[in-house]
């Protein structure tokens, strides 16, 4: 028996410090509890979970932090130490996985998704998705990035890309660092609100070099999570050393959130920013505290990235953010939250035009997936994947965009979701 949960964010609380395990220990002394932070880069666990995982005040794991106070764990684990707890948690059954995938598909169709990029899957889950698609249980198209583990790399890389009409497996998901909200993002200079802390690399630069060299010898794409400016700098430098020798790599920097100004100029159609505009409007309330005024200018700089790259791929990053792509579109063009704050838009010089935002969610996203010849626009010869909305999001006022409702979702010309009044 175990209690699992997700969604806490100390930045939304009056006391913005990390929580502790004290209340969980009182309420659940004999049942392990693991509550994942909203960004997925921290866990709050109770003492029972710590004991089962063998974690104490002396535990150190490269690439992460066991938060302690007076030499004892507080219950918060940041990045890599989370794996120690995850290893002792019960795994979902095959039937539970099937039910979850079907439920996720229905939610996706409801919000007009026809292709989902799943950033980090193991071999077993990829083969399950393929099986469910082949037997007609799953219709959703999936661009599956394999998790960076020896087993996955050894299985998929020698075989080459696996591509069907529903599934594309041709990329590797790597984590360079953690998240800004949990101060796990790797920064060049210390955090403005934690002067002795710079965050940490989950995958250091030497390891990134070795992995990139291996991937570059295959037909796989490298897609690396990079939030902090130190992480982005390392990833872009490693990418540049490799992509110059490749004809059409389309390697992606996932999030590309905080960058040193000269590094923004290094984006191109070979090194693509894969961005999530909702991060800007979710983080804007506290990002300045983490980064300070000067660094903040080069954070969430989507229009500037577009100027150099020529394209940007837009995503929602669910379940970190809401699955609804209309909220992504709204955040990209308005740089406001759902209450219309701030009226002038957060760093409005980096908002995207409606045309760029739409391309980032369609044609450019397809290009970033090597799928621009099959999808991304309504043209003869491409798959008939499209949605009908109840309003024209290219024309209505900004405030009406979040409420846009999907009337119908079409996949391969077939209606897979309908909500017609």
What is each of the regions a protein language model found here?
Residues 152-162, 274-275:
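Substrate-binding cleft/loops of secretory-pathway carbohydrate-active enzymes
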Residues 213-223, 230-251, 255-256, 261-265, ...:
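His/Asp/Glu-enriched, well-ordered alpha-helical/loop segment
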Residues 132-136, 158-167, 244-246, 267-270:
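Acidic (Asp/Glu)-rich catalytic clusters
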């Amino acid at each position: 028996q175990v209690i699992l949960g997700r969604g806490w964010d100390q930045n939304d609380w009056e006391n913005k410090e990390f929580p502790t395990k004290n209340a969980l220990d009182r309420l659940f002394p004999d049942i392990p509890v693991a509550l994942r932070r909203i960004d997925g880069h921290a866990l709050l666990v109770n003492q029972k979970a710590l004991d089962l995982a063998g974690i104490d005040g002396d535990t150190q794991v490269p690439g992460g932090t066991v938060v302690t106070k007076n030499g004892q764990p507080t219950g918060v684990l940041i990045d890599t130490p989370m794996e120690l707890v995850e290893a002792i948690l019960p795994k979902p059954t095959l039937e539970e996985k099937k039910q979850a995938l079907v439920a996720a598909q229905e939610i996706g169709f409801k919000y007009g998704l026809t292709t989902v990029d799943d950033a980090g899957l193991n071999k077993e889950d990829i083969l399950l998705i393929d099986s469910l698609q082949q037997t007609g249980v799953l219709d959703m198209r999936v661009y599956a990035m394999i998790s960076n583990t020896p087993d996955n790399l050894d299985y998929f890389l020698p075989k080459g890309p696996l591509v069907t009409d529903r599934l594309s497996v041709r990329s590797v998901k790597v984590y360079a660092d953690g998240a800004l909200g949990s101060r796990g993002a790797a920064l060049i200079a210390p955090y403005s609100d934690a002067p002795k802390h710079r965050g940490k690399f989950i995958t250091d630069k030497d390891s990134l070099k070795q992995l990139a060299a291996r991937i570059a010898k295959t037909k796989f794409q490298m897609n690396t999570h990079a939030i902090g400016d130190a992480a982005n700098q390392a990833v872009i430098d490693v990418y540049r050393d490799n992509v110059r020798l490749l004809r059409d790599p389309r390697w992606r920097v996932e999030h590309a959130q905080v960058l040193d100004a000269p590094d923004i100029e290094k984006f191109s159609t070979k090194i693509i920013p894969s961005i999530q505009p909702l991060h800007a409007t979710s983080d804007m309330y506290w990002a300045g505290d983490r980064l300070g005024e000067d660094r903040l200018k080069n954070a969430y700089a989507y229009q500037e990235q577009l100027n150099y790259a020529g394209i940007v791929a837009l995503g929602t990053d669910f379940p970190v953010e809401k699955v609804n792509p209309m909220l992504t579109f709204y955040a990209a063009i308005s740089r406001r939250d759902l209450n219309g704050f701030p009226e002038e838009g957060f760093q409005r010089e980096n908002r995207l035009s409606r045309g760029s935002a739409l391309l980032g969610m369609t044609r450019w996203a397809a290009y970033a997936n090597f799928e621009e010849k099959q999808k991304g626009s309504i043209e003869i010869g491409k798959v008939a994947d499209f949605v009908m909305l109840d309003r024209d999001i290219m024309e209505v006022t900004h405030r009406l965009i979040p409420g846009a409702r999907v009337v119908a979702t079409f996949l391969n010309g077939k209606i897979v979701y309908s909500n017609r009044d």
